From Swiss-Prot:
Superkingdom: Bacteria
Subcellular location field: Cytoplasm
Record-level GO BP terms: trans-translation
Chain's role: Required for rescue of stalled ribosomes mediated by trans-translation. Binds to transfer-messenger RNA (tmRNA), required for stable association of tmRNA with ribosomes. tmRNA and SmpB together mimic tRNA shape, replacing the anticodon stem-loop with SmpB. tmRNA is encoded by the ssrA gene; the 2 termini fold to resemble tRNA(Ala) and it encodes a 'tag peptide', a short internal open reading frame. During trans-translation Ala-aminoacylated tmRNA acts like a tRNA, entering the A-site of stalled ribosomes, displacing the stalled mRNA.
PANTHER family tied to this protein: SSRA-BINDING PROTEIN, TMRNA-BINDING COMPONENT OF TRANS-TRANSLATION TAGGING COMPLEX
Keyword Transport among UniProt keywords: no
Assigned protein family: Belongs to the SmpB family.
PROSITE patterns in UniProt: SSRP
Record protein name field: SsrA-binding protein
UniProt organism field: Streptococcus suis (strain 05ZYH33)
Family matches, as InterPro entries: SmpB (IPR023620), SsrA-bd_prot (IPR000037), SsrA-bd_prot_CS (IPR020081)
GO molecular function: RNA binding
Keywords: Cytoplasm, RNA-binding
Gene name, Swiss-Prot/TrEMBL: smpB
Length: 155
């Protein structure tokens, strides 16, 4: 399967609005049993999350996975830091990009692929307010063009 394909559980739509996504990387997550059950139930929130690289390892920070209802004592803290599974070269290249150009790593979506939970991490650059307004104008213009083309073609 290509990057990002699978049973999509959660998406971070706010990230696409606030950031310009330059590149994406698929990563596995180190989870406990109750966390994967909670993710399969769709109880995950990516909105405030980000990824960072510390001492040659990638970590997913501030992603909220709700406690599993039947988890009892095996439930973990909902916003704990989770390790991301990437190859060493991928980690090094992401680290160089983040340190060199002032970009950040944001989770774009979580999905189940071949029975494993994967997260699509985006290498992103923050947008200014005027960039956001420009994106909205461009999107509205594209919609208007499509509407007029559809009206012309349906005659």
């Amino acid at each position: 399967m290509a990057k990002g394909e699978g049973n999509v559980i959660a998406q971070n739509k706010k990230a696409r609005h606030d950031y310009t996504i330059v590149d994406t990387v698929e990563a596995g997550m180190v989870l406990t049993g109750t966390e994967i059950k909670s993710i399969r139930a769709g109880r995950i929130n990516l909105k405030d999350g980000f990824a960072q690289i510390k001492q040659g390892e990638a970590w997913l920070v501030n992603v909220h996975i709700a406690p599993y209802d039947e988890g009892n004592i095996w439930n973990q803290e909902p916003t704990r830091t989770r390790k991301l599974l990437l190859r060493k070269k991928q980690i090094e290249s992401l680290d160089n990009e983040v340190k060199g150009t002032g970009m950040t790593l944001v989770p774009l979506k979580v999905y189940i692929k071949d029975g494993f939970a994967k997260v699509l991490i985006g290498l992103a650059k923050g947008k200014h307010d005027y960039d956001k307004r420009e994106s909205i104008k461009r999107r509205e213009q594209d919609r208007d063009i499509k509407r007029t083309m559809k009206a012309i073609n349906s005659r």
